């Protein structure tokens, strides 16, 4: 019996998501490239991982030009396949391989698109919770899209208690690092502030190697928070009165001299209740003259077009 998977040939492994392996594949009928996320089903008792169910249910109803599109979901044998649109690479690889491509115009275009997508998610009561360069996909036409919704979740008002083991360390908001279980859209905005800074500086803003090191890197730059600049911070579970008292330093020079300095600081505001929203960020003066870049010279994919590398998918 043939299945939809018989229509695809696998070209190469291109990464690993929150769960499962991601392959580039090609449609036999159209020649279109797609991204296939393969998730192994461990057994009848465990079934489909909750992360996969969450991503499928959220993306099925989340249609936006800057959110990666989920085309189909197929179960074959002991594997579940999610068929996504294919984009050339993620933002992390682009920053690593071709730093000179990040002109002020491209950074502005990318941030405008990302904020538009994140604002759309928030309007639809969805937190991404794992925004980082690896989960932002780019193509040669200047598009950037949110991907990997494996840690995303719908949220309600009033707030519910959520796990704080979310968001990759370098992009994790201080309220999560300090143990709060009540958080909202501000955690995504903090992550975007870090990503924004990284595109400008060509390096991570807060590259911590542990939770305490991450906190201290933030404190050294932005000052140790207290009740004056973040009401309620001393009541958070992991706040310590013995934290070193740093007065803060200026942000790195590429940020302080950048036209987006004010916007970045409003995204990195300590108090999550005062942190700028995605909707308001899009109205900031920084974006007044935004023009979307329609061509980006991405690094050449050495495997692109290599028919000899294609193999049967199943």
From Swiss-Prot:
> What reactions does this protein catalyze?
L-seryl-[protein] + ATP = O-phospho-L-seryl-[protein] + ADP + H(+); L-threonyl-[protein] + ATP = O-phospho-L-threonyl-[protein] + ADP + H(+); [DNA-directed RNA polymerase] + ATP = phospho-[DNA-directed RNA polymerase] + ADP + H(+)
Task: Give the highest taxon in the source lineage.
Answer: Eukaryota
Can you give the residue ranges of the Protein kinase domain?
8-287
The record ties this protein, via CDD domains, to: STKc_CDK1_CdkB_like
Active site at 130 (proton acceptor)
Which Pfam families has this protein been placed in?
Pkinase
State the UniProt keywords alphabetically. ATP-binding, Cell cycle, Cell division, Kinase, Mitosis, Nucleotide-binding, Phosphoprotein, Serine/threonine-protein kinase, Transferase
Provide the positions where the record notes the PTM Phosphotyrosine: 19, 162
Q: Does the keyword Cell membrane feature in the UniProt annotation?
A: no
Q: What class of enzyme is it?
A: transferase
The cross-references to PROSITE patterns, in alphabetical order and at most eight, read:
PROTEIN_KINASE_ATP (PS00107), PROTEIN_KINASE_DOM (PS50011), PROTEIN_KINASE_ST (PS00108)
Spell out the Gene3D superfamilies in the cross-references: Phosphorylase Kinase, domain 1 (3.30.200.20), Transferase(Phosphotransferase) domain 1 (1.10.510.10)
Can the keyword ATP-binding be found in this entry's annotation? yes
Kindly list the GO CC terms recorded for this protein: cyclin-dependent protein kinase holoenzyme complex; cytoplasm; nucleus
Q: What is its EC number?
A: 2.7.11.22, 2.7.11.23
List positions binding ATP. Answer: 14-22, 37
Q: What GO terms describe the biological role, i.e. biological process, of this protein?
A: cell division; G1/S transition of mitotic cell cycle; G2/M transition of mitotic cell cycle; positive regulation of receptor signaling pathway via JAK-STAT; regulation of G2/M transition of mitotic cell cycle; regulation of gene expression; signal transduction
Positions bearing Phosphothreonine: 18, 163
Care to name a GO molecular-function term for this sequence? RNA polymerase II CTD heptapeptide repeat kinase activity
The record's disulfide annotation reads none
- What protein family is recorded? Belongs to the protein kinase superfamily. CMGC Ser/Thr protein kinase family. CDC2/CDKX subfamily.
The record's subunit annotation is:
Interacts with cyclin CycG.
Q: Which PANTHER family match?
A: CELL DIVISION PROTEIN KINASE (PTHR24056), CYCLIN-DEPENDENT KINASE 2 (PTHR24056:SF254)
Report the function annotation for this chain.
Like Cdk1, could play a key role in the control of the eukaryotic cell cycle.
Protein name, per record: Cyclin-dependent kinase 2
